[in-house]
Amino acid sequence: MLNSEEIIAAIHGSYATGSKNGFQNVLTLLDKMHVALRTPIVHVAGTNGKGSTCAMLESVLRRAGYHTGLYTSPFLQAYQERIRLDGLPLDDARMVKYGNPLVQAAEEMRAEGAFVTPFEMGTALALAAFDGENCDIAIVEVGMGGRKDPTNIVHPILCAITAIGLDHMAYLGNTLEAIAGEKAGIIKDNTPVVCHPAKEGVRRVFAEAAEKHHAPLRQLSDDTILYAACDAHGATVSYRLSQEWQDVRLNLPGAHQIENAMSVLAMVEELRRQGWTIPDQAVYEGLASTVWPARLEWCGRSLIDGAHNPQGVRALRNFVEEQLPNQRRVLLTGVLADKLQEDMLRDFCAIADDIVTVTPDNPRALDAQTYADALCQRGAHAQAAKSLEEGLAEAKRLAGDDAVIVAAGSLYFAGSLRTALGLAWR
């Protein structure tokens, strides 16, 4: 019998293409593992904010007394973070319990000529754990896109689509409407769907998909926000949806979380219509206590954010300019080569007075010197570090006693930084 570390190694060592769209492999894995898919699922797609939205909804449902499951990606520091039961990462005993049948099923498929990806194995592992642990409800985050994503085997009780932006364009398309069409692929027949505020073209894509599937559609708009006051550690917001939600405290910082929380409230209202018991108190307490690491996360005088695409980096820039307007800032950053775009470079230049670049521990990483050169060409004062440890030390030296270190560029980089800072993942 394999232990947790061996199971995780087997998952990471599976078919090395890393990403493959389709459903059959996950269905075959689940069939071989005798997983019945009985757990009620909320399925969430989107470019940005889907992880935060999932985390907030899970926190609310847990406060309401439900036994919850949560599946997200990628992880920051440890694989087990991706699969949570009642808010806690999958423990070693459950990893062994559900991981061994998973590895055996994958080996049988390889012997039959099929090859599974790490994401397919992770999806099957999560669904097996939710089923085996008799979760009352689980929230499943799409990996990429939606229409062809391996998570799209689920038959959810509710779908949600968060903010749409330009990311994964080689796979999903070069326009917001094309990307929205891929995200809308999670919409199922007669299944309610909640959609984040969006531009008219994107709203039209969602409306057409919902009509095709006879899915009750709730398209949100910023008109429902009655009052909002942001600070460096969260926000206090009032909304008018099916009911008025007064002075909702959000524990996740950033103005973008106001719209994510709006989606959560609309999802709560829809679940209530389906018969789920979710008291107002559970909603207020759940949103006020949500923890989602590396999303504008404060660690002393350091601010860690997983921003890794134009929309995310712009949200980070807006946050530091609004909440830290007179604060000297040092940026510590590492990015993936296939993610970096011109808009991101300009926004990173605006975030800080001094920039230190590092090379993330990822085969897709952009070399730190190449990154620093690109920033300098756009007017920044940037320098490359040879390692994360060297970069962190240099950022601290530049920050001195009065500056804030802002760390961003990649979730992989953010996870490595949390480890370097001694932050626990459990």
Task: Describe each PLM feature range.
Residues 1-48, 52-67, 76-78, 134, ...:
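N-terminal leader/targeting and accessory segments in enzymes
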Residues 38-40, 132, 137-142, 149-160, ...:
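Nucleotide phosphate-binding/pyrophosphate-handling subdomain across enzymes
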Residues 57, 147-157, 418-421:
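Short Gly/Thr/Asp-enriched flexible loops that form oxyanion-binding sites at enzyme active sites
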Residues 109-110, 134-141, 156-247, 261, ...:
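Acidic, Mg2+-coordinating active-site environments of NTP-dependent enzymes
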Residues 199-218, 233, 302, 310, ...:
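C-terminal helical cap/extension that packs against the catalytic core
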Residues 410:
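Active-site-proximal loop/hinge segments that shape catalytic or ion-binding/gating pockets
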